[in-house]
């Protein structure tokens, strides 16, 4: 996986407000107006966090009238899961070879 893309994905999880947004989106698609009501943050702050989440691929948005609607992207989540899963795969090392040669 591209390291830049991986960094964007995990940056999305590194803020309390973004984690709160993701928890709200677990229940399905939500309008930005609903997110604003539930989070008690300003519209510019929400836009900032949604840009990071959308740029990461974890969240996708669609415009309906004057409002944006957001949902969790199953594709983006799958990429994050595969990366994390890859970190836990046991590495094999040649035990006969010293580690610092």
Set out the residue ranges of the language-model regions:
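Alpha-helical residues within the helix-turn-helix
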Residues: 37, 48, 54-55
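N-terminal helix-turn-helix DNA-binding core of bacterial DNA-binding proteins
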Residues: 4-45, 64, 68-76
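Residue-level detector of secondary-structure transition/capping positions
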Residues: 29-30, 54, 85-88
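Amphipathic alpha-helical dimerization/coiled-coil segments
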Residues: 1-5, 75-101
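Short alpha-helical linear motifs
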Residues: 45-49, 87-89
């Amino acid at each position: 996986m591209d390291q830049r893309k991986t960094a964007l994905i995990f940056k999305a999880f590194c803020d309390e407000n973004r984690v709160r947004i993701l928890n709200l989106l677990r229940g399905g698609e939500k309008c930005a107006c609903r997110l604003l009501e539930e989070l008690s943050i300003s519209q510019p702050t929400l836009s900032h966090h949604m840009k990071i989440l959308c740029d990461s691929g974890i969240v996708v948005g669609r415009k309906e009238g004057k409002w944006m609607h957001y949902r969790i992207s199953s594709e983006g989540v799958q990429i994050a899961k595969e990366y994390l899963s890859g970190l836990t795969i046991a590495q094999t090392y040649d035990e006969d070879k010293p580690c610092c040669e």
